[in-house]
Structure formats: structure tokens, C-alpha cells
């Protein structure tokens, strides 16, 4: 057999002729001859029609980034309808490789390859390329412009989970072609949609990853896309509309009842679980009324335009608040037996991300004849994925109605709610998850429900051996936040940032690579202050002294 035939045989299996095991990559290695023009579809663990590679591009060192080789690829869909789109992916191969790799998750509804030279919310120190990581990610199988992909089951499943495996497997082939061996340690880092993707790979592909950082994961993705419509459906009767004028009254009532629950009246609701229990009408004694002090006498609002914290709320407005701050029960259990969507946690941003809106929409009482249909970031998941008609009115959804079977199917594809992480734990995998309770873009209620489901399934002791479920109270989708400038006693106080900074990457790397188990309580800093970072369901309880010092708090239940 001549050399050309030998090289052709090895290329078909994913390896190129002449490659050697090495940690260094030179510009002369960043070529199609070395890295190839395609990858066999058999090397990809989920179905693809073909994998093609673009010509590699060498990026010279430019501070703070070292030199690296960038290669793009495209995975053709199996579906032939034309609605399914190719997955576009990219792999960055550093000149000095540390035998580590990291897959970076997306954001929003995806649609673009993430910036692989950065890792938001992962480290406060040197970046991944600077540390010698090979990094990789994809657009998940659709672009930002066209929407017909939302009518393709393959594209929806790509978004939900398949693109993660496909991109991983393609990246592993290219890393081996570049350096020889596979990575000693492979990680996944993501925030928001990327956080959900981090949970997804632990649940679906546990053998592929050693460590995961997942920030503010949109755990119950299918329900999160539907939830804004559920609120607008609740508000179909004009009497149920919670107007923007009532935001200060709602915020003030949350603060009045919950600020003091952590031992300190400071404009921060640290004891989030106790606050949830107060305003979740499905908990506690039947018929109790956490909003009694805000009800308009005789159910008549004397001044609907009153924007003060003293404004009253009508029975209809309170019924909507009860819906938003209590779990939403499904007509039929969804994937993994999930029976409810946790909705939102009482906080200082009751109108955030469209929880409260100023107008009326098509299908609601009092809407103008030419009123627009309600639209939001994830509405394509309702009209496209669920109703399979992008022109449909999302407010036509009925729980348990004609779309119920499709709802269950989408949940299987999109939701990252499997509580059984035993395979990930058994292979030595570690994860750090961080959420904020003032997050109106994701659902803190659903995140907390997921944490509890994992603990219920696996046991607290086992979970603590491989996972940390950290909660930073009163922080938003970016894990930042401020104290409210009116505390629970109604006093005006100075605004100050809530401490939120901690360096996740070295903690996770030490846990994975050196078996150094992190404590269950860390410290977050910011604005000249510090607070304990507590593992769910604990919270920072004030025990006395200078309130800006983490040492004067304990993590308590």
C-alpha cells in the first residue's frame, strides 16, 4: 500500500497523515493539509449529513491574546425540507496548548457563534486562550434573521441538545488532528442559554465533560418561552391588568414583608426561601392573603395613576401577582415528570423583562382593534415550535388544550430538568451553578425547583460531592444588583452594589484536576463589601456587627 493510500485511510478515520502528539502549534500547522477539509459524519454522535471545514486562519499574538489557529466548519442537516439549517461552528487552537478544552455556550435563542476568546462569568483572571485552552462553540443550527427554522423538528432538537454533541465531537477531531491526543480535561462554560446547555451536557452527554460552570441557566426552557404569554393570558380581563403605575407599591410590599427576614433591614431580601413562602399562595394555610394590606377598599382604586408605594391594588391585579409569584401547574406532567413551572421570586424589579407592561395586546379586553400581538424574546418558541404557525396569536394558548401533546414533546427536547446526574458524578464530573433571585429574564423559581429535584433524587451528601448550587440574592440575569433605596421600614437609604464577584474557574479546575473540594460557603466581593456565597437553600443571615463584612453573616436556612 503506497503512502497516498495510507494517508487516505487515516483521513477517513479522522486523523491526518504526518501528525504527531504535541502541545505546540505553529502557523505552518494551521493549514487544510494538517486539519483537513472535512470530518467523517460517522465521527459525530448525533445525525448529520456532512461536515465541511473552511480554510484555517492563523491569528498572530495580540495582547492579551496569544497566537492561535481558528477554523470554521458547517454541519449539514439530515432533514431535506430546507427549513433545517446547517450548524456553523468554530474551534480555536492555541499555539501553546495546555491539554485542556472548553465548549462555550450561547445566549438568548442562540443564532451566532459565541466569542470563543472570552468566557463571561467564568473567571476574573486570565482568559481561556491565555491559559492554553482550545475553545469551541456553535450557532446551534440557525442564524439571527430567518425564522423558518422554527418549523423544523431537527433544528429545534439541535437548539435543545443535539448541536452540543455535534459541536463537541467535531472539535475533538480537530484537536486531535492539531495536537495528537484528546484533551486531558474538557469543560463546558455557559451563561443563560449557555447555562442551560451546561446542565444539558451533564444530563445527556456526561462522559464528555469533566467540569461545568453554568450561570443563570434557563432550566425549563419550553415553559420559560411560554410564561410571558401565560401572564398576558391571565391579564385578558382588563380588571387583571397590573399596570406600571403599581410597580412601586408591589416592590414596597415585597420589601416591607421580606427585608427583615435575614436579620437586617437594609433593602436586600437575602432570605429568599422565606419570602417565596410568604407570597406563594400554594404554600401554607389555604385562603391566607399575603396582599391583604394592599387591597383597595371595596375593590375600588381611588387613583389608578398613583405611582407611590402607598397605592392600593385591586383584586384582579392581585390575582395576577398571585399567579406570577406562585408555581404554575401543568395540565399534564412534562419531561422528567415535572408538574409545575416555578415562575418568579419576589424582588425589587417586579416589571423587569416584561412581567408588567404598559399596553394591551390583541386578544385582551380593552385592546384597540389594531392592537399588536404580544411579542417577546422567546415568542418564536410559542408560535413556531409549539403552534407551528409564526402568524398565530400566542394568547390563543390554552393549558391542556390542542397543543398539549406538542408541549410535552418540546419539553423532552428543550428542558434541562433531568434530576439524575449520577452518571456525570460517577465519572468524576464537577459543576458550579450560580443564580440570582432578582432574575426576571430567567425563572429563579424554576431554577430553585431544579436544585431541589436533584437533591431529592440523589441526596444532599452525594450532591455536595460533585455540585455547588450557589444563590446570590437580589441579583439579576447578569448576577448584579443593588439594595433598594427604600428599606423594609420605609426609610430612604443610599444605593450600593450587592457583592457578586468570585473567580469560578480556578475553583472548578482545582476540584476537577487536583481533587480539591471547594467549601460549601464562599465569599463574594464588590463595592468595598463582602458577603457569604451560600449553597442552596441557605442564605446570608446577619448576626451582628459591621454589615459590610461577610464574617458577620452565616449561611443559614
Named regions from a protein language model:
Residues 204-207, 211-248, 271-273, 352, ...:
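Hydrolase active-site cap/lid region
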Residues 181-192:
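Alpha/beta-hydrolase fold nucleophile elbow
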Residues 195-206:
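Short glycine-enriched nucleophile-adjacent loop
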Residues 107-180, 226-227, 391-413, 475-494:
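Cap/lid segment of the alpha/beta-hydrolase catalytic domain
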Residues 433-435:
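Short beta-strand/loop motif that positions the catalytic acidic residue
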Residues 76-165, 192, 203, 231-237, ...:
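N-terminal cap/lid subdomain of alpha/beta-hydrolase-fold enzymes
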Residues 19-100, 113-115, 122, 265-269, ...:
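Catalytic-loop region of hydrolases
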Residues 441-445:
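Conserved alpha/beta-hydrolase "acid-adjacent" motif
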